Each structure stands twice: as C-alpha cells, then as structure tokens.
Amino acid sequence: MKLLDTTVLLDFLSGEEEKVETIEQFFEELSQKGEKLFVPEEVIIELVYFLEHGYKWEREDIYEVVETILNDELFNVELKPFIREAIKLYSKRQGTFLDCLKSVKAKKMGIKEVVSFGRRFKKLGFKTVNPYEES
C-alpha cells in the first residue's frame, strides 16, 4: 500500500490532458498489480477545500468526485463511513465539509452540544454553547 497525497488527485482533476493521462495510467498499473492507495481523511478534507475554494467547483461536482474515490477499490479511504456521510451533508449545503465531518463524528459519539462562537452547527442539528454567553 502507498499513501496518496492530495496534489496527485488535484493534478488528476486539473483537466490538463498530459497530467490526467499520466496519473490515470499510474492508477491503472497499481490496480492491475492489486495495490491499494491509502487516502487519509486529511487528503479528502484538503481535496474538498481546494476544489471548492481554489478551483471554484460546485458542491455537487465535489460530491461526485469524493463518492467516486470512496467507491473505487484502488483507494483505501480512512474513516470511509464518516467521509461518506459528511460529503452527503456537505452536498446538501449543511455547512463546510470540515464542519460536516466533525458533526458526523460527534453524533456517532452521542454528542448533542457544540462549544462554538458561531451558530453554524445549528444547521447540523446541534445545540450551540457560546462560552461568552450565559449558560
């Protein structure tokens, strides 16, 4: 198994024909050998961030890319069920991808309140506790 860095995915999605073809061939060779690429959750977080903020992709398109990665046998995605649930929330405009991921993890732990200055977690179904406001 090899660790996959975000930059490779960004190059693959860049639309630059030469980069896309080279990486596609590399992925195909790995797949034929039965090798896997480890994709830590941080890679998915970075990928979503750069596609949204750097490349100005729409959330629906980002959702499709992440789902493709999650469903491809070549990629061993860390915390796959959490990522899958978070990207669904994100695609429905429930918050930033990182907030969606945090909320999925918190809900799995039975957490119902978030200590935060913002109100953005209310959209995700949490009670917000602001340390500067009275309890």
Swiss-Prot record:
**Top-level taxon:** Bacteria
EC numbers, comma separated: 3.1.-.-
* Annotated Mg(2+) binding sites: D5
Report domain PINc positions: 3-130
Q: Which UniProt keywords apply?
A: Hydrolase, Magnesium, Metal-binding, Nuclease, Toxin-antitoxin system
Q: Which cofactor does it need?
A: Mg(2+)
Looking up Gene3D superfamilies in the UniProt record yields:
5'-nuclease (3.40.50.1010)
Q: Does the keyword Transmembrane helix apply?
A: no
Give the family from UniProt.
Belongs to the PINc/VapC protein family.
The record describes the protein's role as: Toxic component of a type II toxin-antitoxin (TA) system. An RNase.
Protein's name in the database: VapC ribonuclease aq_1901
Recorded source organism is: Aquifex aeolicus (strain VF5)
Phylogenetic placement of the source organism: Bacteria, Pseudomonadati, Aquificota, Aquificia, Aquificales
